[in-house]
UniProtKB/Swiss-Prot annotation:
Keyword Manganese (UniProt): no
Name of this chain's protein: Capsid protein
Annotated region described as Disordered, given as residue ranges: 647-678, 697-717
Ranges of Polar residues composition bias in the record: 647-656
Organism: Torque teno virus (isolate Human/Japan/TRM1/1999)
Biased composition (Low complexity): 703-717
Function: Self assemble to form an icosahedral capsid.
Length: 770
């Protein structure tokens, strides 16, 4: 047949190229050949009587050379079993307008109604996480690890399934340490990740039709990892790899087609709030003075929010003293536009700046819609609603402050709403315009301050989570989740506020005379007195404490993140990136052989309703050599006394069903500097403080003499004895851990410390599962 000829024919569209083994010039100098001596001629006679010359073949003798490397072999356990852990997970789920959030942090949320997830993720995978996914029925194991306390990791195959309409970009990281920094989330922005040569594009079926519906990636073991047999407890929390993924838009990379501009607009508080931003009760006098200055400025009431916040209060008859003439119409300015009489107002927050307004009611010609009596309503309404909230909530509501009330406080929609009766008469805010394609990042600063901080300046000690010299559209990506992990406060969105400094906005968000000055942005919905997303259902407790926080500033970060290049614009209600994984493991050990004896008299049928046997999977956390019987523990049909004693000393596990973890296991940890660690140490309770102290053998007696003498004077004898006992116990635990590490090194079971998670020492000391 001619099939072989057709198959061997060279294709015409492939250009000719030189094969690497047929190069004209060799890339490496060869070793000189050994010179051979002259061969000796040997003649022999053939059968036909004719002679033919024959050459004797000399055996080539090579030169003995030493081996450049030696192979270190490790004896394998008697029993080995290959296991593939196969499962399916959503790498990320992005709800509407959640592009700037980290899905790994919100993967276990139960908030409803509202959008779910986030547009980027920082996932990590460990053996513990794989077992947790098995308990959630999200994967299956092809072999059991019961009674097999050793393991080897061989890598993983990842399969990413393409979405019909949305593109994604992923990056696989196997280089330790697997920790998040302030640059991790900005580097995952699609505008940044598109410039990374190690990033992989996952195009949608619409962007690249006609190709496979999945993309396969082979990932080896992490760097700095030695392939050998380990106890499963040692590899339980070792990070195998991290997956960085983000949504992207390849069809419209520079702005959504549903908008007519790429410019982002938001509002920031004016400078009158600089020294009055704190919510502490001790600062109430300053807030009261600012509140009086704002309420006396009548042009601020030229907005429809005045009717929404104060008219129901007046119509309900809550204005004191009550009179028949106290109606909403009594607060409206009735002066017609027939006079040019003017009124001068002092702008709040200053003593020298004055504004001249007409006394008429035409707001388009700098008139005031309401008369001067309206200035008394915000305070009365705020005090009335604050007392009502105190009565309803009782002891759970501790602080009653009318300056922070929803209807008439400092941050009421009357002052902060962007919609004014006349656009040239703004409120107590400044409109900011931002073009992402002019941002070079130089001089940009993004940080958070606690709500108790008394000013808007950046402080190296009080301010947290600084991101500088990056474009705002990149710095806003995953910022709130990074702050929650960095500070350890899972309620950070209600306890801190965002501040921005940038010279690339219009007007510039900076003060040349004060380089550390920041500005507090807020969303359009917060200015209109609404919840994020536009809902008017504000909880009663939040109405009593209405002020800008990260919860109300998230929409500003969302708008900044979506303005960057290749950013996803939330055109679909919900999108997800699915992934299949196949982790390859080898379980090993020397288990005791179990003999199963069945009843021979019981009738069994090979056919019928047969149910497949399920595998018995053991938690790798407790699958340690100390908790497993081995062949050397079994002598003469019985277990030895040492094995029984070893098993009795181990703690037993109790099945306690908790409400769930505060943070998902798949979320990566964050890197803490030494300065942040010292600040956090001051907030820890006494046993942990003692645990973090320097051991006695590393501390000199001269340095301790001064501090101990002062402490001993104030403490009683019993307190000193309790503290010394606590120190001795912690010292004993540390010594036992030290001996355990030395023993692992001697057994060749040590793991590179960069592969282990942070905080493992504390968790092991107190025997708490991280």
């Amino acid at each position: 047949m001619a099939y072989g000829w057709w198959r061997r024919r060279r294709r015409r569209w492939r250009r000719w190229r030189r094969r690497p083994w047929r190069r004209r010039w060799r890339t490496r100098r060869r070793r000189p050949a050994r010179r051979r001596g002259r061969r000796r001629n040997v003649r022999r006679r053939r059968r036909g009587g004719r002679w033919r010359r024959r050459y004797r073949r000399w055996k080539r003798k090579g030169r003995r050379r030493k081996k450049a490397k030696i192979i270190i072999r490790q004896w394998q356990p008697n029993y080995r079993r290959r296991c593939n852990i196969v499962g399916y997970i959503p790498v990320l789920i992005c709800g509407e307008n959640t592009v700037s959030r980290n899905y790994a942090t919100h993967s276990d949320d139960t908030n409803y109604p509202g959008p779910f997830g986030g547009g980027m993720t920082t996932d990590k995978f460990t053996l513990r996480i794989l077992y947790d996914e098995y308990k959630r029925f999200m994967n299956y194991w092809t072999a059991s690890n019961e009674d097999l306390d050793l393991c080897r990791y061989l890598g993983v195959n990842l399969y990413f399934f393409r979405h019909p309409d949305v593109d994604f970009i992923i990056k696989i990281n196997t280089m330790p340490p697997f920790l998040d920094t302030e640059l991790t989330a900005p580097s995952i922005h699609p505008g940044m990740l598109a410039l990374d040569k190690r990033a992989r594009w996952i195009p949608s079926l619409k962007s690249r039709p006609g190709k496979k519906h999945y993309i396969k990636i082979r990932v080896e073991a992490p760097k700095m990892f030695t392939d050998k047999w380990y106890p499963q407890t040692d590899l339980c929390d070792m990070v195998l790899l991290t997956v960085y993924a983000t949504t992207a838009d390849m069809q419209y990379p520079f702005g959504s087609p549903l908008t007519d501009s790429v410019v982002v607009n938001f509002q920031v508080l004016q400078s009158m709030y600089d020294q009055n931003i704190s919510i502490l009760p001790t600062e109430k006098s300053k807030r009261t003075q600012l509140h009086d200055n704002i309420t006396r400025y009548t042009p601020f009431y030229n907005t429809t929010q005045t009717i929404a916040q104060l008219k129901p209060f007046v119509d309900a008859g809550n204005v004191t003293p009550v009179s028949p003439t106290t109606t909403w119409g009594s607060y409206i300015n009735t002066t017609k536009f027939t006079t040019t009489a003017t009124t001068t107002y002092t702008y709040p927050g200053t003593t020298t700046t004055t504004v001249t307004m007409l006394t008429c009611n035409d707001s388009w010609y700098r008139g005031t819609v309401y008369n001067n009596q309206i200035s008394q309503l915000p305070k009365k309404a705020a005090e009335f609603y604050s007392k009502a909230t105190k009565t309803l909530l009782g002891d759970t509501f501790t602080t009653e402050d009318y300056t922070l009330e929803y209807h008439g406080g400092l941050y009421s929609s009357i002052w902060l709403s962007a919609g004014r009766s006349y656009f040239e008469t703004p409120g107590v805010y400044t409109d900011i315009k931002y073009n992402p394609f002019t941002d070079r990042g130089e001089g940009n600063m993004l940080w958070i301050d606690w709500l108790s901080k008394k000013n808007m300046n950046y402080d190296k000690v009080q301010s947290k989570c600084l991101i500088s010299d990056l474009p705002l559209w990149a710095a806003a990506y995953g910022y709130v989740e990074f702050c929650a992990k960095s500070t350890g406060d899972q309620n950070i969105h209600m306890n801190a506020k965002l501040l921005i400094r940038s010279p690339f906005t219009d007007p510039q968000l900076l003060v040349h005379t004060d380089p550390t000055k920041g500005f507090v942005p807020y969303s359009l919905n917060f200015g209109n007195g609404k919840m994020p997303g536009g809902s008017s259902n504000v909880p009663i407790r939040m109405r009593a404490k209405w002020y800008p926080t990260l919860f109300h500033q998230q929409e500003v970060l969302e708008a900044l993140a979506q303005s960057g290049p290749f950013a996803y614009h939330s055109d679909i209600k919900k999108v997800s990136l699915g992934m299949k994984y196949r982790f390859k493991w080898i379980w090993g050990g020397n288990p005791v052989r179990q003999q199963v004896v069945r009843n021979p008299c019981k009738e069994t049928h090979s056919s019928g309703n047969r149910v497949p046997r399920s595998l018995q999977i053991v938690d790798p956390k407790y699958n340690s050599p100390e908790l497993t019987f081995h062949t050397w523990d079994f002598r003469r049909g019985l277990f030895g006394p040492k094995a029984i004693q070893r098993m009795q000393q181990q703690p037993t596990t109790t099945d306690i069903f908790s409400a769930g973890r505060k943070r998902p296991r798949r979320d990566t940890e964050v890197y803490h500097s030494s300065q942040e660690g010292e600040q956090k140490e001051s907030l820890l309770f006494l046993p942990v403080k003692l645990l973090r102290r320097v051991p006695p053998w590393e501390d000199s007696q001269q340095e301790e003499s001064g501090s101990q003498s002062s402490e001993e004077e104030t403490q009683t004898v019993s307190q000193q004895l309790k503290q010394q006992l606590q120190q001795q116990r912690i010292l004993g635990v540390k010594l036992r851990l030290l001996f355990n590490q030395v023993q692992k090194i001697q057994q060749n079971q040590d793991i590179n410390p960069t592969l282990l998670p942070r905080g493992g020492d504390l968790a092991s000391l107190f025997q708490i599962a991280p």
